[in-house]
Swiss-Prot record:
It holds the Pfam family ACT_AHAS_ss. It is an enzyme of class 2 (transferase). The keyword Thylakoid does not apply. The keyword Chaperone does not apply. It catalyses: 2 pyruvate + H(+) = (2S)-2-acetolactate + CO2. Its EC number is 2.2.1.6. GO terms for molecular function: acetolactate synthase activity; acetolactate synthase regulator activity. It comes from the Bacteria. It comes from Buchnera aphidicola subsp. Acyrthosiphon pisum (strain APS) (Acyrthosiphon pisum symbiotic bacterium). This is Acetolactate synthase small subunit. Keywords: Amino-acid biosynthesis, Branched-chain amino acid biosynthesis, Transferase. Dimer of large and small chains. GO terms for cellular component: cytosol. Residues 4-78 form the ACT domain.
């Protein structure tokens, strides 16, 4: 089952490596990971998406709490929360599909952020399901040259 962990940790050298090492040592895969400083520059917020049963995730949480750099671990996927991901993709364009690509991007509330004579670079934010649906549809209208995704960021509501 998909799980999203939000980890507050010290913004220090080696902190990221220790968290990733813990997952690696236990044989757990990290599906996505994001990390950035918080409003307090001494702290960072890490969001990890992984897959595991409740017992495995509980064990990971216990092990994370033992790391000296980790201040708080919250499983945000089980409560009411907001999650987003950003995708940038470069698509091949031709004259008879330009309007279709623009229209699909607008329907998904995305943006065209760069235009050349042969390509568009599109930007879209939303849930993973929304981004997956967009990619599936856009493939019907254009060749996707390159895709880069940010990974999930999330926050609990309330």
């Amino acid at each position: 089952m998909r799980r999203i962990l939000s980890i507050l940790l010290e913004n220090e050298s080696g902190a990221l490596s220790r968290v990733i090492g813990l997952f690696s040592q236990r044989g757990y895969n990290i599906e996505t990971i994001t990390l950035a400083p918080t409003e307090d520059p001494t702290l960072s917020k890490m969001t990890i998406q992984t897959v595991g049963n409740e017992k495995a995730i509980e064990q990971i949480e216990k092990q994370l709490h033992k790391l000296i750099d980790v201040l708080r671990v919250v499983q945000i996927g089980q409560s009411s929360h907001i999650e987003r991901e950003i995708v940038l993709l470069k698509v091949q364009i031709n004259n008879h599909r330009r309007d279709d690509i623009k229209h699909i991007t607008e329907v998904f509330r995305g943006q065209i952020v760069d235009i050349t004579s042969a390509t568009y670079i599109l930007q879209l934010s939303g849930t993973t399901k929304k981004i997956d649906a967009f990619l599936k549809i856009i493939r019907n209208f254009s060749e996707i040259i390159e895709v880069t995704r940010s990974g999930i960021v999330g926050i609990s509501r309330g």
